[in-house]
Amino acid sequence: MRTDLEAFETAIGHVFRNRDFLIRALTHTSHAYEKSQPPSQDNEQLEFLGDAILGFLVSESLVSRYPGYHEGRLSILKNYLVSASHLHEVAQKVGLGEFLLLGRGEELSGGRVKKGLLADAVEALIAAIHLDAGIDEARQFVVRHILGAEQELGESIDSPFTNFKGALQEIARSLNLPSPRYTVVQELGPAHARRFTVEVAIGSDLAAQADGDSKKSAGQTAAQMVFRRLMEHAE
């Protein structure tokens, strides 16, 4: 566990006036329990508050940036931006896991890299920033670290966004659709110049195929195509 909180504050772009808020946001229930601390010292309540703040700030930004979007399109973007998968990516980028206060059992079970645990800690951090410095500072954190993918997904579906597979997975889940299924349907060319065709399907009605020089790139392009169709038909 790292204790140089100044480095973490630099990574997130906010220096706490009251560092107790930051420490609480980083304190998992397992650590508080082992130290016999009251529930008010762990990050669960901050997570609860941060979830609401995040939802509001993301919704506010989307409505402002896309006045012509129907509710369905806005919901697709929001569902991805507040998803555990996306918040997990945010946590990894700022190195949040390295600074968490965990109980011994959680530490041994890999808590520093668990998706749900890190996503919850990001929500707690948003609440901590809000309590420390107000909603405008929380908004700056959300814009800087969470809304970066929104422009790539919403404004330019043909942009070089690299995680359409992750976005499609989360959106399918939020819409109660089957999980995307990826199938390599064709491989052509010599070993040094192989081309792959990958199909992604959601249920039996929504599918797309794409070519690429790797299975990964073909899968991402196919996921991008299905994502575009979901956006076009969302109302």
Q: Residue ranges of each PLM-predicted region?
A:
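Double-stranded RNA-binding/processing signature
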Residues: 1-235
